[in-house]
Structures are given as C-alpha cells and as structure tokens.
Amino acid sequence: MPRSLKKGPFIDLHLLKKVEKAVESGDKKPIKTWSRRSMIIPTMINLTIAVHNGRQHVPVFVTEDMIGHKLGEFAPTRTYRGHAADKKAKKR
C-alpha cells in the first residue's frame, strides 16, 4: 500500500543533507548510503547514489522515471544462481 499523500515522501535526514550539499557544490561523486527505505525525490536527479545491498554499495544513477520509488528497489539483495541441474539427465 502506498504512502499517504498527506504525509509526503520519506527521506532520511542525513541523506537529504548529503544530496543538498552535492547539488549545491555540483559534485558528481557517488553518495554512499545504507538508507534503502528513502524515497527518490526530484532533487536527486542526475546524481549517483551508492545504495548498500547488505554486502557492497551498488551505484544507482537517478533518472526522472525513478522519482517516487525507493532506493532499495534498484539495489537487489539476493543473487539467483539457478536451480541445481539433474545429475541423472546429464549422464545420458
């Protein structure tokens, strides 16, 4: 269920400060964050945000289409390696 419009978007304060500082200075270095729950807002456009996936920081370049989504949606936490092959079928 989406967040109420009355409440507005949620973004961690420490991340918001880093974003505003990067926009103000024009810095293009990735912003490291562990805040997967923060929503992408219009001031983040054209910034690279390194989102933690539990093991490493995944660089996410923010575009207009991503506004309203959460940062964690673009940094997958699980790797799918495929199902185990049937050993009997390979021997034939």
Curated annotation (Swiss-Prot):
Coiled coil (UniProt feature): none
GO biological process: ribosomal small subunit assembly; translation
Gene Ontology CC: cytoplasm; small ribosomal subunit
Gene3D superfamilies for the chain: 30s Ribosomal Protein S19, Chain A
Swiss-Prot/TrEMBL keywords: Ribonucleoprotein, Ribosomal protein, RNA-binding, rRNA-binding
Pfam families found in the cross-reference section: Ribosomal_S19
HAMAP family: Ribosomal_uS19
Family: Belongs to the universal ribosomal protein uS19 family.
Protein name (record): Small ribosomal subunit protein uS19
Organism: Aliivibrio salmonicida (strain LFI1238) (Vibrio salmonicida (strain LFI1238))
